[in-house]
Structures are given as structure tokens and as C-alpha cells.
Curated annotation (Swiss-Prot):
The lineage of its organism: Bacteria, Pseudomonadati, Pseudomonadota, Alphaproteobacteria, Hyphomicrobiales. Keywords: Chaperone, Cytoplasm, Nickel insertion. UreD, UreF and UreG form a complex that acts as a GTP-hydrolysis-dependent molecular chaperone, activating the urease apoprotein by helping to assemble the nickel containing metallocenter of UreC. The UreE protein probably delivers the nickel. Pfam families: UreF. The keyword Chaperone applies. Required for maturation of urease via the functional incorporation of the urease nickel metallocenter. One of its GO terms (cellular component) is cytoplasm. It comes from Rhodopseudomonas palustris (strain BisB18). InterPro entries: UreF (IPR002639), UreF_sf (IPR038277). The gene is ureF. This is Urease accessory protein UreF. HAMAP family: UreF (MF_01385). It comes from the Bacteria.
Amino acid sequence: MATSTNSQDDAALSAAQAAALYRLMTWLSPAFPVGAFSYSSGIEWAVEAGDVVDAPTLQAWLAAMLSHGTGFCDAVLLAHAHRAVISNDDDALRSLAELACAYVSSRERHLETTAQGRAFVEIARAAWANGRLERAVADCAGLTAYPVAVGIVSAAHGVPLAATLHGFLHAVVSNWISAGARLIPLGQTDSQRLIAALEPAVIATGARALIASLDDLGGATFRADLASLQHEAQYTRLFRS
């Protein structure tokens, strides 16, 4: 039987590290009830329009959304929300919460991000309440976009920003793939291939967002933004966005 000779491999997580990992995995799990399964971020219209028809076209669509659209922008907002809570900058957090809600490209995307944000905060407060979280929620004083909510909760509980960013982007991409798989449709193996194929983009986007300023917010995914707008008038649909 092989025995590890690397002491780092065998080192146990500290109690704080284990708690942070446990909470992050819980909060960003598909089982965490924020209703993500009911939103497609416009992918449903892209399938109907013929832009997304199989695994390769879905991969290309999602890679663009991740690197140059919603994925990157949401990650930047998350990072700045996390830092505002850590630094106790109430004014910055309040301003960021307003910016995040104003920044979305369509009515349905606004519903998608604020409904999930509200659910995320409410459930986290009920199950993992603490004073810092209550203060941050009070600072927002209104609608909270999903990435801002994740940034607030993770910072309030001391979960490191870099890990939170990568976990968040993985969760977002996984939900997009799940929506695409139901619409095209795709099998489970193809879905996992897509998750594997998008791993480099998730890592790169998280790294970019970690050092980005709010001036870097912006996208180049006009077709995806149009899909989100067109979905509002789509006659037959499974998803809310």
C-alpha cells in the first residue's frame, strides 16, 4: 500500500479552514435553495434561435458569457462586495449594491439576480447568522444582486475571497450547463465534458476579477444580452430568464 511522503498532503485543515470550505460548498451547491434551476440567462432563447444547438456551440456561448459578459462582471461585483465588508466600508457596500442592480441588461436578468440574491441572504441569515452579516445586510437596505449577496455572506463568515470567486463562477457555469442540457438536450456525460472544458476559463476569469476595478466592468456579449431581452417575449418557455 502506497504511503504519502508529503507532509502537506497529510496536514489537516484548521477548524477555520474546514468551516470556510464547508460553508462555501453548501452555499454554492445546487441544493442551496435560491431557485437557480429556474433561470437560463437567455440560453433558452439562444437555443430557439439556433445559436446554441449542441455541446460545442453551448461551450462557445458560455465561454463568451463567462469571460466577456455576465460571468466576469458578476465576479468583479462579488470581489468588491467582499472587500467592502472586510474593510467595514458601509458607503462603498451601499453604492455597490445599487450599482449591481442597475447594471443588469434586462428585466428578466434583474429578476434573476435579485431573486437569487434575496433568497441567498435570507437563508444564510437563518442558518448562519452573525452580527457582521446583519450589519452588511442593513447597509444594502434594499434589493441585493446575487454576486453581491455571495460576497457579503462569504466575507461576513471569513471565507477567503479567491476561493469564493472560483466557487461562485463554478456554480454559475454549472447552472448554465444544466439549463443548456435540458434545452438542447444533452446527456450527463456531455455536461461533465463541458464543465471540464470550461475549467480554464473559470480559473482565468476568477483571477482577472480578483484584481479588477469597477472601471473594468463591461461586456462584449451583445448576442447574449439580446437573448436575455428577447426571452421576455418568447412564447413557449421553461425558464424565467
